[in-house]
Amino acid sequence: MDYNVKDFGALGDGVSDDRASIQAAIDAAYAAGGGTVYLPAGEYRVSAAGEPGDGCLMLKDGVYLAGAGMGETVIKLIDGSDQKITGMVRSAYGEETSNFGMRDLTLDGNRDNTSGKVDGWFNGYIPGGDGADRDVTIERVEVREMSGYGFDPHEQTINLTIRDSVAHDNGLDGFVADYLVDSVFENNVAYANDRHGFNVVTSTHDFVMTNNVAYGNGSSGLVVQRGLEDLALPSNILIDGGAYYDNAREGVLLKMTSDITLQNADIHGNGSSGVRVYGAQDVQILDNQIHDNAQAAAVPEVLLQSFDDTAGASGTYYTTLNTRIEGNTISGSANSTYGIQERNDGTDYSSLIDNDIAGVQQPIQLYGPHSTVSGEPGATPQQPSTGSDGEPLVGGDTDDQLQGGSGADRLDGGAGDDILDGGAGRDRLSGGAGADTFVFSAREDSYRTDTAVFNDLILDFEASEDRIDLSALGFSGLGDGYGGTLLLKTNAEGTRTYLKSFEADAEGRRFEVALDGDHTGDLSAANVVFAATGTTTELEVLGDSGTQAGAIV
């Protein structure tokens, strides 16, 4: 049965506060055992119902809101509202609500004319509780101009579907999936949100994302991550099709998660890596188009690295393991350092199969002793045999990747555009002819203490074509050697140049690398690759219901 809000006194004139009239129609539908509350075309202004967890409009079992179409029926927060509103439209906190939703309308948070954090759609039970909302359907809904989240279904929700909907110009994420089970996001678009386009968090599992698009967002296009609390990781998630492009950070970030498949997507033009796997296991990256990323920093198109949460809630070091990257077409921008790169942080068991990689400075760099490449001849890094301390490791006339061991190695790239990583120990590095990259994957690879020097020496750095890759170390740029910067200086004779930090780790080690000759006039961000600005993903606290303390990013 349909309940027309105008029969309950709603005007939809863009001026009057219609909250009470719309809620009366919802209550009538619920009292009758369920139904559809219909809002004809018009702008319906609403105010806060009371506490943040009361929202503006409270849906109940069996009740759906329906309008005349996105942009035709608009529910808009009144000017001057100064209250926190956890869901302009929402379900009740602490109650199990089922068989409800909304379709064919727009929610407008009016963020330019209000204050207080306002979310668009919110539903969920109680974090950590045994109950859940069930059977939720949202179709053809636009959520815009919220100061908080656009769509924010929360823990726990079972069998939720959001399809053919849009979230844009919101202050945080466009779409959140916070502890959803057996749920689907399909054919949705998130753009121009201040943070992520899509944020999948807090133990969400058995979840499918099909043909969604995220572009022009202030952080990542799509994030799948655990978050602040020590909970079960998001898992068994399929991301199929769609596009993630022109976002400020990663196109897709998979962090502290497991059993994820990303396939058939177009990922391009993002500020950082196209895909970043960060402390995740059993990830499959299949048949995607990944291209022209690294727009804001020198980073790989696809980056595999582990995540250190030992100081966090879990006390765990999340090693990235068992990543399968197959059948992708990967091409780089001018800043793309590698097509696919593993960090030297324990990441291992990566399988790279039949990927087409072009237009990057180097195609592949792997450190894991069990990681493999097939379909790309010559892409596997060359590594010295055990006990090669002091023995030379020499490349040939092609583009080589030379990896030192734990001793004082000597690496000579020979001809070609080579990658040299001396590893631990005091190494001597020579790129030879070609545009070479000298990689430092850990601060302890090249350092000094108050009593000893263990820095590597680069013998033939050519500033016009060679590069020093420090992106794994977290330094932000050149400076005075403090605050995450490196000081550039020469010795008294001007025969040796140093890049050095004055900030020691717990063992008293301060990063330092030496270059033969005076390079004070030619080392810059053009040939020294620092950590990408804003590419680390902190675990920020997110707002939940009016009684919850917080969630994750």
From Swiss-Prot:
Pathway: Glycan biosynthesis; alginate biosynthesis. The keyword Iron does not apply. Coiled coil: none annotated. Pfam families: Beta_helix (PF13229), HemolysinCabind (PF00353), Pect-lyase_RHGA_epim (PF12708), Peptidase_M10_C (PF08548). It is an enzyme of class 5 (isomerase). It catalyses: [(1->4)-beta-D-mannuronosyl](n) = [alginate](n). PbH1 repeats lie at residues 133-155, 157-179, 180-202, 204-226, 234-256, 257-279, 280-301, 320-342. InterPro entries: Beta_helix, Carb-bd_sugar_hydrolysis-dom, Hemolysin-typ_Ca-bd_CS, Hemolysn_Ca-bd, PbH1, Pectin_lyas_fold, Pectin_lyase_fold/virulence, Peptidase_M10B_C. Its cofactor is Ca(2+). GO terms for molecular function: calcium ion binding; isomerase activity. Optimum pH is 6.5-7.0. GO terms for biological process: alginic acid biosynthetic process. Converts beta-D-mannuronic acid (M) to alpha-L-guluronic acid (G), but introduces almost exclusively MG blocks, producing a polymer with non-gel-forming capacity. Composed of one catalytically active A module and one R module. This is Mannuronan C5-epimerase AlgE4.
